[in-house]
Amino acid sequence: ARRDNPKYSAGKTKVLRNIFDVLDEDIDVLVELIGGIDDAKTLISSSFEKKIPVVTANKAVIYEYGDILFREASNNGVDFLFEASVCAGTPSINLLKNDLAGNKFLSIKGMLNGPSNFIISQMEDGMSFEDSLSFAQENGYAEADPTFDIDGIDAAHKISILSNIVFGSPLPPNEFLIEGISNITKPVSYTHLTLPTRHGG
């Protein structure tokens, strides 16, 4: 916690005021959910140096520093788990790494961003982009500042992670085209966006 909250008590749970103090504790695993990039990267790297495995849902830090973090985890012989960083914990990462490991992948297609998914669904029913976004914000499906979602940044982070797993090669930050849904001006069908393709065999 960053400040005392007079309404709630942590009970017997130890509350730390500095996120890095957790590394001075006797812990078996670090669960990183602070978000952001730089502090998260430092915290995760420091955990690996102390031979502490890490679980994270932070797609942004994996997008920016994934190669470094995976290497640090491997060099220190600890696990680095990140299932919740893509598709809200739906077991897509485990599925690709293990259950489908023997398959040959040619491409990855899908709707990876929740707010965009909702907005496109509304547009498919005839609602305009602006009205769909407003409706999503009013009902808590989109942030007050939806830029991260509707400009494709969130989806780019996720597709980079999945690409690294499937093709064994990350998509370097800022080296591939990112286009969100904010330029869609008329109702559109899902089939135009995420039509899956089957290649024989």
Language-model segments: which ranges?
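Conserved small/polar residues in nucleotide/adenosyl-binding loops
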Residues: 191-197
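Core active-site phosphate/anionic-ligand binding loop and the adjoining beta-turn-alpha structural block
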Residues: 66-67, 79-190
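N-terminal glycine-/serine-/threonine-rich beta1-alpha1-beta2 phosphate-ribose binding loop
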Residues: 1-49
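ADP-ribose/adenylate-binding Rossmann-like module
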Residues: 35, 50-64
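Structural detector of well-ordered beta-strand residues that form the stable sheet scaffold
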Residues: 16, 53-55, 81
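Rossmann-fold NAD(P)-binding glycine/threonine-rich loop
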Residues: 59-80
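Short glycine-rich anion-binding loops that position phosphate/pyrophosphate groups of nucleotides
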Residues: 35-37, 60, 85, 113
